[in-house]
Amino acid sequence: MGRSNEQDLLSTEIVNRGIEPSGPNAGSPTFSVRVRRRLPDFLQSVNLKYVKLGYHYLINHAVYLATIPVLVLVFSAEVGSLSREEIWKKLWDYDLATVIGFFGVFVLTACVYFMSRPRSVYLIDFACYKPSDEHKVTKEEFIELARKSGKFDEETLGFKKRILQASGIGDETYVPRSISSSENITTMKEGREEASTVIFGALDELFEKTRVKPKDVGVLVVNCSIFNPTPSLSAMVINHYKMRGNILSYNLGGMGCSAGIIAIDLARDMLQSNPNSYAVVVSTEMVGYNWYVGSDKSMVIPNCFFRMGCSAVMLSNRRRDFRHAKYRLEHIVRTHKAADDRSFRSVYQEEDEQGFKGLKISRDLMEVGGEALKTNITTLGPLVLPFSEQLLFFAALLRRTFSPAAKTSTTTSFSTSATAKTNGIKSSSSDLSKPYIPDYKLAFEHFCFHAASKVVLEELQKNLGLSEENMEASRMTLHRFGNTSSSGIWYELAYMEAKESVRRGDRVWQIAFGSGFKCNSVVWKAMRKVKKPTRNNPWVDCINRYPVPL
């Protein structure tokens, strides 16, 4: 059983090493077998520089909160032992200039603090577009639409069918019907038509829910990775809703499925420098424009997973919105691994040998994704984990650092653990080399993981030690809507709201990853109990059927 579990995480690759130059096998071709993990145990190795980075963020935010209690304690200790008469006597002993100067410095310091501290950013509400039923397809209908287009041979269609059966995607996802066309659908006209449908659908719902007029929006950020026309999608939104001329608009492209959190981060920065403003963030992807019509299996995979979807989020930094906001933005941590060549090319848009454009998925994707995820959660940990978990983590880290047994076991970690598991023996040296895995359930009540695929979600659950309930929103979103790219984490939050599981004070962790390779996290805190929606929620008509087994 132990060996089976170990092998499940491994993949093999035959590497051609060329012609043997010397020895008994001179002149013969040689090969080697490289063994890789599907998704590395990213919590089994910790880079201290990312732990340090997390504490750097924490100190930057908490320096004032740590200083003020100390000053209050010192002042209380000095004044607490004096009677009222003694206090007045001491004040009378000082001249007027000293007293005025002291209070002047105090007031100035308080003003500088309140003026320089980051403004709170609130999430007023959000909307997720639900396409019409004419776009709904089952897995069998999806294959038939692809066959009807006449662009795929039976071998490619069979490969698509096998991928879909193991994907975790259900029979009610949405695709543009144009994928069945024998003509070229990756045109600007087709892309604009799909973009206007999903973006305006989400924004109409958002403006209805928040009762904010489009002209009152001061910041607009639109992210779409593949489809980037001129004029931009943000300009298309401004034109459609006749927004004001001095709006700060941004259009993010080519940043993959994690771009939604990047857009939130950009909107937050804009709100810090523009008081009393609303910001709208739109996240989407165009399925038809990204449709690949070749036979390269590594480029066919995105066709099987990506589905129609769009989210629109209303943010505000106005203090009066504190009362009716749903969530407050707590933390954003971004990780970018593009400096590494393997990470940079793990998801890569290019043409195949026949000249057909598409996204190529590298065999290294799971490995580089795990590394990016490890870096991100290591940086996020000090900001969100309770002090008890941080103490246990550092105790385990010190034990691994200074224990000779841990150092020895590190060099032979794979062989030792494999042998121990095979023989059913618990290895003490392996225990020393294994770091303490923090319990993230103590830091968050709700988890929204990017629903990339069933396998990815299973690996995340295992490595983070999460329960089925923690993963429910991500799995059900994958089943009902498929991979909607950067908007997927909002469909997951909408699922939680439809289940009435979000209560005042709850912390929500959204995490997404995409090309580059990037992994980004955002943490929200619920400002109030979110009531079950009766309309304007993509889950309203089907929430009673969920969860379902995958």
Swiss-Prot record:
Keywords, sorted A to Z: Acyltransferase, Endoplasmic reticulum, Membrane, Transferase, Transmembrane, Transmembrane helix
Reactions catalysed: a very-long-chain acyl-CoA + malonyl-CoA + H(+) = a very-long-chain 3-oxoacyl-CoA + CO2 + CoA
Domain of life: Eukaryota
Top EC class of this enzyme: transferase
InterPro entries attached to this UniProt entry: 3-ktacl-CoA_syn (IPR012392), ACP_syn_III_C (IPR013747), FAE1_typ3_polyketide_synth (IPR013601), Thiolase-like (IPR016039)
Tissue: Mostly expressed in epidermal cells of floral and vegetative meristems and, to a lower extent, of leaves and coleoptiles, especially in young tissues. Also present in trichomes and phloem. Expressed in siliques, seedlings, flowers and leaves.
Main location: endoplasmic reticulum
Membrane topology field: Multi-pass membrane protein
Note: Called 'FIDDLEHEAD' because of the shape of mutants, in which adhering floral buds cause curling of inflorescence, resulting in structures reminiscent of fern fiddlehead.
The name this protein goes by in its record: 3-ketoacyl-CoA synthase 10
Annotated source species: Arabidopsis thaliana (Mouse-ear cress)
Gene from which the chain derives: FDH
